[in-house]
A protein has these predicted regions:
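Phosphate-handling architecture centered on phosphoinositide signaling
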Residues: 2-169
Length: 169
């Protein structure tokens, strides 16, 4: 939603996601942004664009650029209750997995969007709830296969003294 009034310029957009009669066993993430931020051939972060090479991994494609776009992020728990929502920045994340049809996304808290950090318990196995960014992963090189390698390795690393990325399916 946006305010429109004669002789008034509004810098404030408000988004809201509604989910009706959803039957799901995992959390739901909703991302709302102007379509061109993701799908414009000139500036969309999710598409090949006009400069992509014709062969994998499609260097020159828009998704190889370090572009950040504004997005409204909403996170719904398994019981359909809204857990958290905020304005953020979004970038394509990863190495060659960016070339997959489903791409990983980094969601960034930044003061210019309204939050300097994300304060929410996304993960049960960590002792902190404050994050500068979260990653919505496409399972990397396991994409279109088992889609569980990243999660399985994270589980194996939980009791080690090494840093690891936790997950929430």
């Amino acid at each position: 939603a946006k305010i429109f009034k004669e002789d008034y310029i509004s810098n404030y957009d408000q988004s809201k996601t509604f989910i009706f009669n959803a039957d799901h066993s995992i959390a739901i993430v909703s991302l709302v942004s102007e379509p061109d931020n993701f799908f414009s051939q000139e500036s969309g972060i999710y598409v090949y664009g006009n400069n992509a090479s014709s062969s994998w991994p499609y260097f020159g494609a828009n998704f190889w650029n370090d572009w950040e776009r504004p997005v409204h992020f909403s996170y719904y728990e398994k019981d359909n209750k809204l857990g958290i929502e905020f304005n953020a920045g979004v970038k394509i994340f990863g190495g060659t997995s960016r070339s997959n049809d489903q791409r990983s996304l980094s969601i960034f808290a930044r003061n210019k969007y309204g939050l300097g950090e994300i304060d929410y318990p996304f993960f049960d196995n960590v002792s902190y709830n404050k994050f500068q960014a979260i990653i919505l992963r496409n399972t990397g090189n396991d994409w279109i296969r088992a889609n569980m390698r990243d999660a399985a390795i994270s589980k194996l690393m939980q009791n080690s003294d090494l840093e690891y990325q936790d997950f929430n399916p």
